[in-house]
Amino acid sequence: MDIRMHKFSDKVPEPTLRRLPWYLSNVKLMKEQGETYVSSTQISKQINVDASQIAKDLSYVNISGRTRVGYEIDALIEVLERFLGFTKMHKAFLFGVGSLGGALLRDSGLHHFGLEIVGAFDINPGLVGKEINGIPIYHSDEFEIKMKSCDVNIGVLTVPINIAQEITDKMIAGGIKAVWNFTPFRIRVPENIVVQNLSLIHI
């Protein structure tokens, strides 16, 4: 992903790196609900990760909570965003403009992760050439051409399961360095490629 997440990969276990964005999105949601402090137990109830594991994961980002109170929510958000590199926006392409892909284009919530979708790809002639929320939809065959003219290294995967690996391979061959996978299929990627396996509940 050419962002800090990749930079810290030598120091932080990969499973931890994959979980940190979940924590960030849930903490932001709690802030919107009026919370000023959040505990690892509260986060655990939202994402089904053991509270002790969450506390261990957060120890890597140099923030400590208060006994029986938890973490100051604004400070935790700031630390996680800075650690993950989400303080700046990163451009992304979306692959698969079905119901899920369309929903993400209309109101993705991905900006919480520092992602800005600047283009989408599909093969449906009824979609190609149109825009959703100001985001253009291109034919999948145009991907490599668009990669040459856009500063994009992140791909958001929302295609049907049966072509998830095929499209992932095409994305990586075209220069994508990180994949945000919203399909149930666990894609296989080279070691130097970052993958986030997500669903709408995470955003």
Map each language-model feature to its residues:
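HTH-adjacent hinge/linker in prokaryotic transcriptional regulators
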Residues: Y37, T41, Q46-M89
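Rossmann-like NAD(P)-binding element
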Residues: I145-D169
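Conserved small/polar residues in nucleotide/adenosyl-binding loops
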Residues: I201-I203
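Extreme N-terminal segment that seeds HTH/winged-HTH DNA-binding domains in transcriptional regulators
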Residues: M1-T36
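Glycine-rich Rossmann-fold phosphate-binding loop(s) that bind the pyrophosphate
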Residues: V97
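NAD(P)-binding Rossmann-fold cofactor-contacting core
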Residues: F113-N133
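Glycine-rich, highly charged phosphate/nucleotide-binding loops
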Residues: I135-E144
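ADP-ribose/adenylate-binding Rossmann-like module
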Residues: K170-I193
